[in-house]
A protein has these predicted regions:
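Terminal connector regions
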Residues: 168-204
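Buried hydrophobic-core signal for structured, non-transmembrane domains
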Residues: 117-124, 164, 177-181, 225
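Beta-strand/loop-rich accessory regions of lumenal/periplasmic or secreted enzymes
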Residues: 170-172, 199-285
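Intrinsically disordered, low-complexity Pro/Gly/Ser/Thr-rich segments with frequent PxxP/GP/PP motifs
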Residues: 134, 138-173, 178
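Extended substrate-binding grooves/exosites of carbohydrate-active enzymes
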Residues: 1-119, 124-130, 135-143
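Local beta-strand/beta-hairpin segments that build beta-sheet-rich folds
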Residues: 145, 159-161, 186-190, 246
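Extracellular/periplasmic ectodomains of large secreted or surface enzymes and adhesion receptors
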Residues: 77-79, 90-100, 106-107, 193-211, ...
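Exposed beta-strand and adjacent loop surfaces of beta-rich binding modules
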Residues: 131-135, 176, 218, 236
């Protein structure tokens, strides 16, 4: 129950005499299910791994004064508060972002998109993909510019390669292909970059005409049309070029993030609060 994916794989390697199933492997409270793919990948590698179960499908909540409420909203104490909100859909049956991740992980069709070929794998046991419509969209800089539709014969537990119908000539724009399988509505979808604009390089002009100024608190670098100030405590605090300041506030590292709902329950703040302190009081040495 809630065994780490790496530990599940270790068990599967060491015990090849019986199937393995997780009664629960994902607790869908709040911002969660981001690691679900790790367990799904194990299903593709080990036939003895039978998968697991998500806790759970729908949030439990009651309407009160026109809004959905959970523990504590009715004035009761003690309470488990939001621990009843563990669903991949909200209590009013609308989807959460978690539903999209689960939908993607659980799909029976895999796509791998190359510049010339789209590789399709059908993991259904009995269904041929010719029952669905295949739609492909070409996106440039995030905008759909071309759409192609077709039917593809791909028998259960087999793979097929389809020629990518889009020709990429303009390499100054980011290009991606989105593939859909539809049957009156979207069933599967996957998007992949086929050309990503790389950061353009610029020639760096070096100069020896710089002055270094140092005092007890700061180190300054002064050159033609620019100056930089480093605080001995906070690091980079100012960078000016042609009288334009590019640093609004001192740059500082961040080793901590806000806790998710699941983090709160497993005492994340207590265990990792020291990294928040390190972020707030970091010093240059």
């Amino acid at each position: 129950m809630y065994t780490f994916a790496v530990d599940v794989e270790k068990y599967l390697k060491e015990h090849q005499d019986k199937p393995f199933i997780l009664c629960e492997y994902a607790h869908s409270m709040g911002n969660s299910n981001g690691a679900l793919f790790k367990y799904i990948d194990l299903e593709k590698k080990y036939s003895l791994y039978q998968g697991g179960f998500i806790w759970d499908y729908i949030d439990q909540a009651l309407y009160h004064d026109g809004k959905l409420c959970y523990g504590g909203d009715f004035g009761e104490r003690p309470s488990d508060y939001d621990f009843c909100g563990n669903g991949i859909v909200f209590a009013d049956r609308t989807n959460t972002p978690k539903m999209q991740e689960v939908k993607y992980c659980y799909q029976y069709v895999d796509f791998r998109i190359d510049e010339d070929v789209i590789h399709i794998s059908n993991n259904y046991l009995f269904t041929d993909l010719n029952e669905y419509q295949l739609q492909m969209d070409l996106l440039r800089n995030g905008n759909v510019v071309q759409t192609k539709t077709m039917t593809v014969d791909c028998q259960p537990l087999s793979s097929v390669d389809v020629e990518n119908p889009f020709k990429i000539n303009d390499q100054d724009q980011e290009c991606a292909v989105t593939v859909y399988l539809k049957k009156n509505h979207e069933i599967y979808a996957q998007q992949q970059y086929i050309y990503e604009v790389k950061n353009k390089t610029h020639n760096i002009h070096t100069t020896k005409h710089v002055d270094i100024v140092e005092d007890y608190l700061n180190v300054g670098v002064v050159g033609k049309d620019f100056n930089v100030i480093f605080s001995k405590q906070k690091g980079l605090v100012s960078y000016r070029y042609h009288q334009q300041e590019y640093i609004r506030v001192p740059v500082r590292p961040n080793f901590f993030r806000a806790a998710t709902n699941n983090d709160v329950e497993n005492k994340y703040g207590y265990r990792y609060g020291k990294w928040l302190t390190a972020s707030l009081y970091a010093k240059c040495e």
